Amino acid sequence: MSLEILDQLEEKIKQAVETIQLLQLEIEELKEKNELSRQTNEQLRSENEHLKTEHHNWQERLRSLLGRIDNI
């Protein structure tokens, strides 16, 4: 192989390594974003469940009050 071909091969290898490193960084960033999204999702689900329970409790109280009014 000529020196020129080896230089071209070396340059392509360097570019490939740089591309791989950039992709690895991007993967790490995406993993972090994914984890943050997962945590946010879990918090929202928990809050939603709490609000549903609270809503149900208010409905029960309202039904009870309406029942008392009907008995008057």
UniProtKB/Swiss-Prot annotation:
| Matches recorded under InterPro entries | Cell_div_ZapB
**Region entry Disordered, spans:** 36-56
Q: Where in the cell is it found?
A: Cytoplasm
Which chain positions lie within coiled-coil regions? 1-71
Arranged from A to Z, the UniProt key words for this protein are: Cell cycle, Cell division, Coiled coil, Cytoplasm, Septation
Give GO BP annotations, semicolon-separated.
division septum assembly; FtsZ-dependent cytokinesis
Q: Which ranges are annotated Basic and acidic residues under compositional bias? A: 44-56
Identify the Pfam families for this entry: ZapB
Where on the tree of life does the source sit, at the highest rank? Bacteria
> In UniProt terms, what function does this protein have?
Non-essential, abundant cell division factor that is required for proper Z-ring formation. It is recruited early to the divisome by direct interaction with FtsZ, stimulating Z-ring assembly and thereby promoting cell division earlier in the cell cycle. Its recruitment to the Z-ring requires functional FtsA or ZipA.
Query: What does the annotation say about its assembly with partners?
Result: Homodimer. The ends of the coiled-coil dimer bind to each other, forming polymers. Interacts with FtsZ.
Q: What is this protein called?
A: Cell division protein ZapB
- Native organism is Histophilus somni (strain 2336) (Haemophilus somnus)
